[in-house]
Amino acid sequence: MEEPKEITLSEIKKVSGVGPPASLVSLAQWASDRWLGTRAHFLRTATHTRIVPALPKTSASDKHKVVTQTLAEESFRRNGAVVRVAPSIDDFSFAVAAASRGRALILAPTLARAQHLYVAMKRAGFDVALHPRDWPQSAAGSITIGTRSAAWAPIPKLDAVLVLDEHEESYQQESAPTWNARDVALERARRDKAPWVITSPSPSLEALTCGAPLLTEDRRRERDGWAIFDLIDLRDRPPSAGSWCSEELARVLRKESRVVCVLNRKGRARLAYCEQCGTLARSETSGKALGLEGDELVSALDGERRPAVCDACSSRRFRRAKLGVSGVAEELELLTRRPVTEITADDEIDSVDTDLTVGTEAVLHRISAADAVAFLDFDQELLAPRYRAAEEAMALLVRASR
């Protein structure tokens, strides 16, 4: 491009900081066209929150010759592969296979997984950066590990891309534009002609139809990596404790073992019905279903209260239906005579002292290990009126199996 004669360009006196490389500027234009957003939106994600005056003198371009798991090495030799793995498989072997090729981008679904892998790679002698904390090291060419935003890590040119548990919904940006970190990472690999691998115990439809080969472990090893699942049909069984506890679950709960109960429903109970005639308790004015709290029927929507008296037969004996986390916790304490901890997404709990825990799916992120995990109403997950409810339900089983 020729310099216009009528314009005199000023000399650049100072560069305040380092920004994303030119490849990410081009990638931001591609992302804005695909997800109907602005280029500035994606460039903000790719830019460090603080001014970076200069990059450190570090490089991860030297390739490490490391012998790793056969499946991990084979997957990267394919240049692009989808690998179905068991939930209990260690991420380290795939991370080492990616890092041994040079400047690698490794995406993990949660910050805890990313930090754990970062520490393991550091101990193995790799030059690793944790995004976004180590943004300058990433821009200098270090192996970069991070969560969703790390798809925009400022690595100049990629030598390998690894996406762990690509089925996790945490890779999807919730606010518009709703971009997916997996798609961004694979586009970067395509542009840099770098081998890429995505792993998952339950690959998504996008992964299975992307045209890459599907690789799996030995069938016995894959089966051994999953927890044992018991499917209990409660339709024809008398409940041992309320409407949520089967005989099999009651036996597990009575043992001195650590049990986690998952129920994606808050509160004590959504519904109440007459124990004598089976009539559902409803508001006399609006007709809304009422729940039972002590000796009163209460609406969870507007707080309406009235005495617990059946409109049909005048009975005062009611039973709860559609119990929430609080209701199950109360009945669980009565059944086992042991303390129970409630955990929802609103609770800030770092450690749990009790062996019995009840909560929403957030409990699977707070509890690192358990002897048994019980989903008290899995039909609610399978039949939820939302897009891809079945895939999200499968993701819960994967998380629980770990």
Regions found by a protein language model. Name each.
Residues 1-235, 243, 252-255, 277, ...:
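Accessory, non-ATPase domains that flank or precede helicase/AAA+ motor cores in DNA-metabolism machines
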Residues 17-21, 107, 111, 175-178, ...:
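Conserved phosphate/pyrophosphate-binding and hydrolysis machinery centered on Walker-type P-loop NTPases
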Residues 28, 145, 185, 261, ...:
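Conserved RecA-like P-loop NTPase ATPase core
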Residues 112-123, 318-346:
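Short, charged N-terminal beta->alpha structural module
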Residues 116, 120, 184, 210, ...:
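Alpha-helical scaffold elements adjacent to nucleotide-binding pockets in ATP/GTP-utilizing enzyme cores
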Residues 240-335:
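Cys/His-rich short segments
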Residues 377-402:
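Conserved RecA-like P-loop NTPase helicase motor core
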